[in-house]
Swiss-Prot record:
It comes from the Archaea. Its EC number is 2.7.2.17, 2.7.2.19. It is found in: Cytoplasm. Involved in both the arginine and lysine biosynthetic pathways. Phosphorylates the LysW-bound precursors glutamate (for arginine biosynthesis), respectively alpha-aminoadipate (for lysine biosynthesis). This is Putative [LysW]-aminoadipate/[LysW]-glutamate kinase. One of its GO terms (cellular component) is cytoplasm.
Length: 261
């Protein structure tokens, strides 16, 4: 099995090339998507300014209060069904899910989180409606049909929760014992010194996470990739905006994080 994560940057720019490439892998893939840019757009239309939290180590997450949660679920629902409908137009039977459907992804709500405030001090704040994944029913994700999964989980109390899409992709890949995890974004891979880094070991990825060379979402991707590679899963970070992006990733494009290079 392969796990394909369609990043929000791809979803909001042009996901058509990924979608057109998916029929080739419909019998052995699970698709997970993001869509934070649409969440931001809808929030601003409603007069709500998106809020983000910076955590120790430089990782950034969305602060999700009740109103933001409603917009988050709405945006992810639209993206999910857009992908499913597009696949239907290509003759692929696909099933769009959130983690709440069939209890596919159960998470525990983070009631408190540690953040770095604007003065650089650590403090504990309310966690909002953000979850830490506790269980994935991977048997419900096995094709056929091709499953398209949104990063929305359910708690044991029946709460809808925002979960990180990259973390979800990693957890699905781990539980499914996937051969490869493909993270598609709007960049060609990890770029250092103006060039794409073609190969990394898990240890090299970990060092970069701790350095100042890598920032934002790439830091989280490398952290997840390092953990996955240690389990024997090959991780590819590459562009979802090129022709046949899944083919390209499997044929050497992007940055490959592999246990033994």
């Amino acid at each position: 099995m392969i796990v394909v994560k369609i990043g929000g940057s791809v979803v909001c720019k042009d996901a058509s090339k990924v979608i057109q490439n998916l029929p080739k892998y419909a019998d052995r893939a699970v698709v997970i998507h993001g869509g934070g840019c649409l969440v931001n757009e809808l929030l601003k239309r409603m007069g709500i300014e998106p809020k983000f939290l910076t955590h120790p180590g430089g990782l950034v997450s969305r602060y999700t209060d009740w109103e933001t949660l409603k917009v988050f679920v709405m945006a992810m629902g639209w993206i999910n069904k857009y992908i499913v409908a597009s696949l239907h137009g290509l003759g692929v039977q696909a099933l769009g899910l959130t983690g709440a459907d069939l209890g596919v992804v159960v998470a525990k709500r983070k009631e408190r989180v540690l953040v770095i405030d604007e003065r650089g001090r650590q403090r504990v704040v309310d966690g909002g409606y953000v979850g830490k994944i506790a269980e994935i029913r991977v048997d419900k994700l096995t094709p056929p049909p091709l499953k398209v999964l949104a990063p929305v989980a359910v708690s044991e109390k029946g709460e809808l929760l925002n979960i990180d899409g990259d973390q979800l992709a990693f957890d699905v890949a781990r539980e499914a014992k996937a051969e490869r995890l493909i993270l598609l974004s709007d960049v060609e891979g990890l770029i250092l010194g103006g060039k794409v880094v073609p190969r990394l070991t898990p240890e090299e990825a970990e060092k970069l996470v701790k350095s100042e060379e890598v920032r934002g979402g790439m830091k989280r991707k490398l952290l997840m990739a390092s953990e996955a590679a240690k389990l024997g899963i090959e991780v590819v970070i590459s562009s979802g905006l090129v022709d046949s992006p899944i083919d390209a990733a499997l044929n050497g494009a992007g940055t490959h994080i592999i246990k033994n290079i």
